[in-house]
Amino acid sequence: MNYIYPVNQVDIIKASDFQSQEISSLEDVVSAKYSDIKMDTDIQVSQIMEMVSNPESLNPESLAKLQTTLSNYSIGVSLAGTLARKTVSAVETLLKS
């Protein structure tokens, strides 16, 4: 998952047209999306660990790529945390009313 590049408007439209017979509640949708984010971050962690453990990773190109990958990972984890907080806040607001 690459967070630096802008999101395509077509992707947003496709995401808004999301219809599935399996997912029927807000809880299921949120759970499915967070599990997708978890899988993506697990993949990124394994890629980062692979890059760090590679003895050839000390050249400038590899270090620049590692820095970009770490930056994308950090942005993704921060975004997931923010979205989780916002989701919890929205659910609490709905439950109060």
UniProtKB/Swiss-Prot annotation:
Keywords: Plasmid, Protein transport, Transport, Virulence. The keyword Cytoplasm does not apply. InterPro entries: T3SS_SctI-like (IPR047754). The keyword Cytoplasm does not apply. One of its GO terms (biological process) is protein transport. Necessary for the secretion of IPA invasins. To S.typhimurium PrgJ. This is Protein MxiI. The lineage of its organism: Bacteria, Pseudomonadati, Pseudomonadota, Gammaproteobacteria, Enterobacterales.
